[in-house]
Amino acid sequence: MSVDHLISPFRDKQTLLVLSNAIKKLASKLEKKLVIMEVCGGHTHSIMKYGLLDLMPKNLEFAHGPGCPVCVMPRARLDEAYELASMKDSIVLSLGDMMRVPGSYGSLIQARGKGLDARFLYSPMQALEIAKENPHKKVIYIAIGFETTTPMSASVLLNAKKEKINNLFFHINHILVPPSVSAILEDKACQINALLAPSHVSVISGAQIYTPLVDRFKLPIIVSGFEPVDILESVLMLIKQALNKEAKLEIQYKRAVSFEGNTKAQELVNACMEVRENFEWRGLGNIKHSALKLKESFASYDAEKVFKACLSHKTSKENKACKCAEILKGIAKPLDCSLFATTCTPQNPIGSCMVSSEGACAAYYRYKRV
C-alpha cells in the first residue's frame, strides 16, 4: 500500500518556496550569522538530497554534526570486532554499515573474504535465532547506535537471558547524543549557535534530554523531522528564537516526538545497561559518560569481559589527510578534504564519513559533487 499521500505534504514544492521566502525575509534581520548544526546524519542527507542549502540565505550556515554512529566509532572498537571474528568457533553479527568500516585489520566484510564468519543482520532479533541454530559456536552481536537502536539490543539481551541462550554475547557500542554535542559546543573553535536535534533519538529518549544543553549553552534547539518541510519549518523556528534573543527547546516533529519519550523502551535499556565512565569517539576523543555498557548482572553476556584475553585494545592512527574529525565537529565540510571524491569514494572509503550511508561525505558524494 502506497504512503505517498502521507509524505507528499512534507515535500510540497509550493510549501517549500513559501517557507524559503519566509526564512530569507526573517534572516535579513539577524544581527549575526546563524550557524545551525544538524546533529543527525539523516538530516544531513535530507538537506543535501532536496537541495535545501540552495534555499538558504548567505547569513545562515549548516554545520554537519556527529549524529552518525558508524562515523564516530573509533578504530579500536572496529579492531575489537575483527578480533572477535578471528576467534575459533565464533560468529560475529552486525547491522549494515558497521560491516563495511575498515579498522587497522580491514573491515568485517574483508574478514568474510578471509574465511571468518561475519554476518549482516536485518534485525537484532535474528541474533537469537542464529545463536539457537549454532549452539556450539560463540555468537557475538556487535551492537551499535544512538538511543534509537539501544532498546532493540536490550530486548535481544533480555530475551536471551529469559530463554537461557548462553552462547550469545554482546559487544556494546551504544552511544549518547547529548554528551557528544556538549563536547563540540565546549570547543573554543566552535561557531555553532543553534541546533537541529535528532528526531528518531528523541522518539525514544524524549526531547527532555536536550534541556541541559539549552540551560548550559544558552542556544535554541528544535527537534526536527526529516522531511524538507520539517527542516525548513525548524529553521524558521530557530531564526524566530534568535531574533527574539531566546534560547529554548521546541519540538517541531510533534507527530512523533514527545517531551518524555518512550518510557517502555527506556525501561528496557535501564534494566540491563548503565553509563560508561569514558568512551572514545572518532574525531572527538574521549568523552565522559557518553556511552553505555552492560550492567554487572549481565557480565556473562558481555563480550568485552568474557573474551578480554582475545582483545588487544590497540590504537591506530587515522590517515592524516582525512578530515573526518573536523567534519564530525562541524568545523569543516566534505568539500574541504583533499581526498574527497578522488582517493576517497564509497567504493574505496578512506574515512568513516564516506563509509556510512548516514555520513556527511557520503551525502555530499551522492548529491553535491562539484
Where on the chain are the PLM-derived regions?
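Short, conserved secondary-structure transition motifs
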Residues: 174-181, 261-264
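Metallocofactor- and cofactor-centric catalytic cores in central/energy metabolism, strongly enriched
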Residues: 2-136, 150, 154, 158-163, ...
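A conserved active-site cap/scaffold subdomain adjacent to cofactor or substrate pockets
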Residues: 171, 191-258
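Internal helical hairpin/lid segments
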Residues: 233-326
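Internal active-site segments that recognize and position negatively charged phosphoryl groups
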Residues: 140-142
